Amino acid sequence: MKYLLILLYFILSAGAVNANAKALAVRDVFTCQMEAFVQWDWEKTELTGYQKQQFKFSITDENTVKFEEASYFENLALNISYIGYKILALNSEDGNIVAKLKDDKFSIVAISYDASDFITAKCERL
């Protein structure tokens, strides 16, 4: 009986932690630290690594995420294609940029005729 009560306590407390986690919402602001930034250049057929930066972005309305200007993203605005409890999916109007945020993991891919960029970062909600 004692073990059953202990097990029940742990199950209920795990549920309480999840219930208190905050869902993604309009006006949320995230600060991120890049872990990798690489670019494939089709003409040179080479992969180049770039300096990792910090950047910020916010969910400005139900349809838009905007990045601050002091980074590689320079006021980039992306459309929200999906927003869930802890997941955010983004894309550009032309479909050349796709980004995902799940928990604290952020990835963004940009594709053009000349090059493809890939960035990963760890993010924290402010």
How would you describe each model-predicted region?
Residues 62-97:
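Contiguous, well-ordered beta-strand patches that form the walls/edges
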Residues 15-22:
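Sec/Tat signal peptide C-region and signal peptidase I cleavage site
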Residues 51, 113-126:
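Edge beta-strand at a domain terminus
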Residues 98-118:
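Short, exposed beta-strand-loop hairpins at the edges of beta-sheets
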Residues 36-39, 68-75, 113-115:
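Short, solvent-exposed aromatic-acidic interface loops
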Residues 58-64, 83-86, 100-107, 125-126:
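Short, solvent-exposed coil/turn segments at beta-strand boundaries
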Residues 4-15:
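Sec-dependent N-terminal signal peptides
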Residues 26, 31-64:
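Short, solvent-exposed loop/hinge segments that bridge or flank secondary-structure elements
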